[in-house]
From Swiss-Prot:
Protein name: Stress response protein nst1
InterPro entries to which the protein is assigned, alphabetical: Fungal_stress_NST1, NST1
UniProt-annotated location(s): Cytoplasm
Ranges of compositional bias, category Basic residues: 53-63, 146-160
Region (Disordered): 1-197, 288-368, 422-468, 508-815, 857-942, 966-988, 1145-1193
Main location, first listed in the record: cytoplasm
Keyword entries, A-Z: Coiled coil, Cytoplasm, Stress response
Organism listed in the record: Neosartorya fischeri (strain ATCC 1020 / DSM 3700 / CBS 544.65 / FGSC A1164 / JCM 1740 / NRRL 181 / WB 181) (Aspergillus fischerianus)
């Protein structure tokens, strides 16, 4: 193919073609680019034509285009070619119209960063088409433009973010040039460049250059670039394209074929870019001329061409540089098709090419087959636009095709044109994206083209040289498109730098002008200030003169006023001094009175302290006297105890000697009896028999195991009269009594009870006697004890002799014995103490009257097993563990002779005996020597225990009388001689029938029996003596009479609320009651001692002796503890009276707690009855509240 003479354009014409590019290269101020609306477009009513078949129309147009190309190829050039050749820049009115469009009210500002709007492209297309109304296809130009406009309007809604509508949309690879190091500003919009054209010539500068000047500037910029800078631009472009290709092929396969293909692509790209740079260099060095071989090169990279607003416009301007090809109108139509393709591609969001677009591409490619340059031009534009949009798939496909052709040419040159063409489709292609593979679309295009005969003819006519030329032109077009952006970018950088420098200079000039202007204003303001200052100074002087005159007048008036004030001040000072003297005199008088008052108070406190000191001294003297007396008594008691121990040992030795011989004879009988007792168990014997034999001193207190001899009746021996001294000695020591019998004992024989009981009596007695010894083996206090707190003396008859059913009170029975080995719970209480709290002792104390028919409690049980209805006990008398010989009954201290020992009529009824618990078998002492050895070891301990129990009462002379103050001289548990031991809690009879003394046991829930409480010093009141006149004398009261209380025998140990403690508790209660009684309240809680004494007398039990005032005051001096109620008493005296006040402390709070202790807890009292206490009827609550556990065991 021989080029036409005017194929290569001169630089000047190229410069003219690039005016629009230069106009649009100015930077935008805000990043948004404005596109002018075209006012030359005809209205829709003018341009709308009848709808036609688009495909057929395109086919007809392309057929006409091919005919025109053949005519042009034959040398027939249309006269409109030259006109069309310069249509893009030969009409200056177009820019004015654009400017007018920009100034119009419909001026748009897209916000998506697009440089040009589609309306601007329509305007350009309309101008280009209107320039050639007489071309070969001139009759259809208006219809085509109208169709294009309608299609563009239809697809414009989806093209807000399109970058393919112009070549200035964005810079695809913003690689800085060698001359600039900062990023480029965006290109200047077309309407801003159009504004610059309308500026006057005198205002033209770097900010507003004309199109011609812009062209000259771009030309000068390109020519001024050195060889190295130009090569650097090409190198940057080549590196960017290689990098993009590598990114696109990163996910392709790694087979050998693909690897060779990639290598071939890189090599082909190197070769193409090197050849392209040589052509560029040649073009820059030789501004005009033609290349020596082949068809003419595509002009340099459209450096000075008009702006490519769309791929269509780019194609059209490229076609204008080859007028010999005759592609002017045909390319315009193809541009429209490509625009439609882009519009529809953008409308289709999910797939890159729609079916309609593929159909249009089929027609396009069929037309392009007739002209390879047109095909390459169209494809290259699209590939370049895709690469500008960061989508290099089409470019890579194009390069792969070139590489495949090269490899195919090297490997298989013998197949010629057909094989070369086949290599386009049979290559081992692995596109990076399966859904958007361009080769598949191209294959479809080629398949559809091959269906047409005339396309197949042209394909067969292609040669390898033409294919290579086609690929070369395609790459040149692509490289020109891309390189154009690089050159424009470099130029824009330079222009932006110049404008930036110019802007800085203008800003500096403006700042200088502002400074000068401000300086001038400051000078003028200073002048005005000076003028005002002078005027103000004159006014100040005038005002100062007037103020001086006024001050002089005021000073004279002030002096006169001060003189008057001074006189008034002197008068006030004199009055103040006078008042101060009077006030001081009053304060001195008040201070004197206060000092006198303090002195009197101090003297009063001193007198009170002296009185308290004297009281304490007196109290110390009394305590010292008591202590000495106590020591003397203890000394006497110790001597008497030693004497008694000596006598008891002698007597015990005699008894053991006599008894040892008898035991040796009856050894075999004792063994048999022991066996029978282990098999059958001991059968309780009548209580009278226990009275006779069960509690002899030798058996009860002998430390040896007695032999189990049968109880046989002895000959009656007349009882010899007992002397008072003997009675005293016997009552204080059980060892001193001889095992004598009463005449009444001789009448009792084993026939009055079952024969089987005789064997259990001795065994039971021996075990109980051993248990008593174990209990007595405890340290005892050496303080004198009242007889009420002692154990039953040996001379008593058995406690079991108390009738179980007093007259009118039937069905009462005591609890059976608890076994042979007595516990040691209260060790001092002997066999009369119950080992379980809340139940009667094994001594057979009957139950209270009115609770009938209840069964006896089995041993070891805390409650009755099967109580009858209504708490009825069986009317059976359980014999005690042991009994006391009747002859050993202690008498009154006044040596009253012993009374009758006959049985009480209350005991005459039959007493069935339940079988008691069997005793364990023990080996009796075989010889008298063994018994004597055991007696020697324990004699001394027994004597000590007895002396501790009996205290110093054994030392009393015949004429001695106990102290009158019973409570003040006794320890807890003591009772006064001549008083009636009564219940501490549950006396239903009240004080009139059964008085409740202060010394009564607080744990005796029912009555305290004379046999149990040990009150032997006074005449014991038998049941019926005071309340029942028909009762017998006291002599029979121990054996058969009912107790002196309403509910029989109760407390088994001594009471433990002494008289001082009781009186102190009464005083505390009286003070508390007076505090709560408003009429008797004293000042600050103090009460008159006489009033307190009257209140105490009201609270005192009737059977207690009266309390004197001195005794009460002495007790108030004692310190409080947990036993006596705690707290302290404050005594205050005045001229005539004494006052007392009780102040509680922490020990006082213990009273409420002790009242809430239930039986069974630590510190709780030991109840003496099997029935619960009935709440202390008739007993002061203060005694129940502040009573303590037994002391001095």
């Amino acid at each position: 193919m021989v080029p036409a003479p005017h194929t290569q354009h001169s630089p000047s014409s190229t410069m003219l073609n690039s005016s629009s590019t230069t106009a649009h290269a100015a930077p935008s101020t805000n990043g948004d680019v404005h596109a002018p609306k075209d006012h030359h477009l005809s209205s829709p009513s003018d341009t709308v034509s009848a709808p036609v078949n688009r495909k057929k129309q395109k086919r007809r147009q392309k057929q006409a285009a091919r005919l025109a190309e053949r005519q042009l190829a034959n040398g027939h050039v249309s006269t409109d070619d030259t006109t069309q050749n310069g249509s893009s820049h030969a009409n200056p009115e177009r820019y004015h119209s654009d400017d007018g469009g920009a100034d119009g009210p419909d001026h748009e500002q897209p916000t998506n960063g697009d440089v040009y709007d589609k309306d601007g492209q329509d305007s350009m297309d309309a101008h280009v088409d209107s320039q050639n109304p007489q071309g070969p296809n001139g009759t259809e130009s208006s219809q085509k433009s109208t169709g294009r406009k309608s299609k563009k309007k239809k697809g414009k809604k989806a093209r807000n973010n399109s970058h393919a509508q112009g070549d200035e949309t964005s810079t695809p690879m913003s690689t800085p040039s060698v001359s600039m190091s900062h990023p480029l500003p965006p290109p200047l919009p077309s309407h801003l460049a159009s504004h610059n054209i309308l500026k006057p010539a005198k205002n033209r500068s770097i900010w507003n250059t004309s199109t011609q000047e812009e062209r000259e500037n771009i030309k000068t910029f390109w020519l001024e670039l050195g060889e190295e800078e130009r090569r650097q631009l090409v190198k940057v472009e080549k590196d960017a394209v290689l990098k993009k290709m590598k990114e696109q092929q990163r996910h392709s396969c790694s087979c050998t074929v693909c690897g060779r293909k990639r290598t071939a692509i890189e090599e082909e790209l190197e070769v193409l870019y090197d050849a392209y740079y040589e052509e560029l260099e040649q073009y820059a060095n030789h501004n005009q001329g033609s290349f020596e071989k082949g068809s003419p090169m595509v002009p340099p990279p459209r450096l000075y061409q008009p702006p490519l607003r769309s791929p269509g416009q780019h194609t059209r301007t490229q076609g204008q540089f080859h007028p010999s090809r005759g592609r002017i109108h045909e390319l315009t139509e193809e541009d429209d098709d490509l625009e439609e393709d882009y519009d529809e591609e953008e409308d289709d969001g999910d797939e890159p090419y729609s079916d309609e677009e593929l159909d249009e591409e089929d027609e396009e490619t069929r037309a392009a087959r007739a002209d390879f340059f047109a095909f390459g031009n169209s494809l290259t534009v699209k590939v370049a636009d895709d690469l500008l949009k960061n989508d290099g798939k089409h470019f890579i496909d194009m390069m792969e095709q070139l590489a495949e052709r090269r490899m195919q040419r090297e490997e298989d040159t013998q197949y010629g044109i057909a094989a070369a063409h086949e290599s386009l489709h049979s290559g081992h292609n692995h596109g990076p994206f399966d859904d958007e593979d361009y080769d598949d679309e191209e294959d479809e295009d080629y398949d559809s083209q091959e269906e047409e005969d005339y396309e197949e003819d042209e394909m067969d006519a292609m040669t390898e040289e033409q294919r290579m030329e086609e690929g070369r032109r395609m790459f040149q077009i692509f490289a020109a498109r891309m390189f154009e952006q690089r050159v424009l970018t470099a130029y824009r950088e330079k222009v932006a730098e110049q404008r930036q420098q110019k802007l800085i200079e203008e800003l500096m000039e403006e700042e200088t002008r502002n400074e000068q202007r401000n300086a001038k204003k400051a000078r003028e303001a200073q002048k005005r200030k000076d003028k005002k200052r002078l005027q103000k100074q004159a006014k100040e002087e005038e005002r100062a003169r007037r103020e001086a005159e006024k001050a002089a007048e005021e000073a004279a008036a002030k002096a006169e006023q001060e003189k008057k004030l001074e006189e008034q001040r002197k008068k006030r000072e004199e009055q103040r001094k006078k008042k101060e003297a009077e006030r001081k005199a009053q304060e001195e008088e008040r201070a004197r009175k206060e000092a006198e008052k303090l002195r009197r108070q101090r003297e009063e406190r001193e007198r009170q302290a002296e009185a308290e000191r004297k009281q304490r001294e007196e109290k110390k003297r009394r305590e010292e006297a008591r202590r000495k007396e106590k020591e003397e008594r203890e000394l006497r008691e110790k001597k008497a105890k030693e004497e008694r121990d000596r006598k008891a040992q002698e007597e015990q030795a005699k008894k053991d000697t006599a008894k040892g011989g008898e035991e040796a004879k009856d050894q075999e009988k004792r063994d048999d009896q022991a066996k029978r007792s282990s098999q059958q168990g001991p059968v309780p014997i009548p209580s009278n028999l226990h009275h006779l034999q069960g509690f002899s001193p030798a058996v009860a207190h002998s430390p040896h195991v007695p032999s189990a001899t049968p109880v046989l009746p002895k000959a009656p021996t007349p009882a010899r009269p007992r002397q008072p001294s003997q009675q005293d000695s016997h009552s204080s020591s059980p060892h001193s009594q001889a095992p004598s019998t009463d005449p009444s004992q001789a009448s009792l024989s084993p026939r009055s009870m079952p024969v089987s009981q005789s064997s259990g009596v001795a065994s039971g007695n021996s075990q109980q006697g051993h248990g008593l010894h174990a209990m007595l083996h405890q340290p005892q206090p050496s303080t004198p004890l009242s007889p009420l707190g002692r154990s039953i003396p040996p001379g008593f008859s058995s406690v079991n002799g108390i009738p179980p059913n007093p007259p009118g009170l039937s069905g009462m029975v005591a609890r059976p014995p608890v076994g042979h080995d007595l516990p040691s719970y209260p060790p001092h209480s002997g066999p009369f103490i119950s080992p379980f709290r809340g139940y009667p002792a094994p001594s057979g104390i009957p139950a209270p009257p009115g609770i009938n028919g209840a069964r006896p409690m089995p041993p070891g049980r805390g409650f009755p097993l099967e109580p009858g209805q209504g708490f009825a006990f069986h009317g059976q008398q359980i014999p005690g563990a042991f009994s006391t010989p009747q002859g050993g009954l202690p008498h009154r201290h006044s040596r009253q002779p012993s009374g009758s020992l006959e049985r009480s009529p209350l005991e005459n009824h039959a007493q069935p005996m339940p079988i008691s618990r069997p005793s364990p078998i023990k080996r009796p002492s075989s010889t008298q020597q063994d018994q004597q050895k055991g007696g020697d070891r324990t004699t001394q301990r027994d004597v000590d225990d007895l002396s501790a129990h009996l205290g110093s009462s054994a030392l009393l002379d015949d004429t001695d009388v106990p102290l009158s103050s019973t409570l003040s001289q006794s320890l807890p548990g003591a009772t006064a001689p001549g008083t009636f031991p009564g219940p501490a809690r549950a006396s239903f009879g009240g004080p009139s029938l059964f008085p409740d003394p202060l010394s009564a046991s607080k744990h005796a829930n029912f009555a305290v029996s004379p046999a149990v409480s040990g009150g032997t010093w006074g005449a014991q009141i038998p049941f019926g003596t005071s309340a029942f006149p028909s009762a017998q004398t006291w002599g029979t009261g121990h054996a058969s009479g009912w107790s002196n209380n309403a509910f029989g025998s109760g407390g088994h140990h001594r009471a433990h609320t002494s008289r001082p403690v009781a009186i102190r508790l009464l005083v505390i209660q009286a003070c508390k009651q007076l505090n709560t009684m408003s009429p008797f309240k004293g000042a600050d809680g103090y009460h008159d001692v006489n009033l307190v004494l009257r209140q105490v007398e009201q609270l005192r039990p009737q059977n207690e002796p009266s309390i004197s005032l001195k005794e009460m005051l002495d007790i108030c001096d004692t310190e409080g503890n947990t036993q006596n109620g705690g707290g302290t008493f404050s005594i205050k005296k005045d001229e005539t009276r004494e006052f007392v006040k009780f102040e509680p402390d922490n020990n006082s709070a213990a009273s409420g707690h002790r009242g809430s202790i239930v039986p069974g807890e630590i510190g709780s009292p030991v109840p003496s009855s099997s029935l619960p206490a009935f709440g202390g009827i008739g007993t002061p609550s203060v005694l129940r509240q502040y009573s303590s556990p037994p002391m001095g065991f």
